[in-house]
Amino acid sequence: MELSQSRYLSALPELTWGIQRFCLVKQSKQEKYDKAYLRMAHEWGKLSYCKRKQVGAIVVKKRMIISDGYNGTPTGFENFCEDDEGYTKWYVLHAEANALSKVAASTQSCEGATLYITLSPCRECSKLIHQSGIKRVVYQIEYKDNSGLEFLKRAGVELQHLPTIESAV
C-alpha cells in the first residue's frame, strides 16, 4: 500500500505539469479564435454608415457564426446616423441589438453563445445580452460608461477584454 502511494506521489508533479500544459494550449487556441472573431466583428463594423462610431458584433455558438450586426438606422430609414449637429439620432440601433434581433427572427438561439463586439455594451444592450442567454462577451474597446459590463458581470456573464486583435503571423 505504501509503495503505490509513493509511486502516486512521485508521478504527481508530472501529472500537474501535463494538466497545466493542456490548459495553456487550450487557452492559447481559444484566444486565437477570440481574436479571429473579433477581427470579423471589426470588419463588420466598417459596414456602418455612422460617422462617430462604427461598431460590429458577431454571435458565435459552437464555433459557428449564428448572427452579425453593426450599428445603424432601422430598416426603412435613411442611412444617416447623426443629426445636423453631429449627435447620434435616438433611434439608431447598436450593433449587438441588431445581431440579437436577427437571431430572434431566426430558428437559432443565443443560449450559451459568445458575443464578439468591438465596443463594450451599454447598459440597455447589456440587459438584452443577458436576457438572450449569451454566456460570454469578448470586446475590444471599453465604452466610457462601464455600467453595462458591471451588470453583465453581476449576471454571471463571462467577460473577456482583448484590446489587441491583430494576428500573430
Where are these regions (language model features)?
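Zinc-dependent deaminase catalytic domain
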Residues: S4-V169
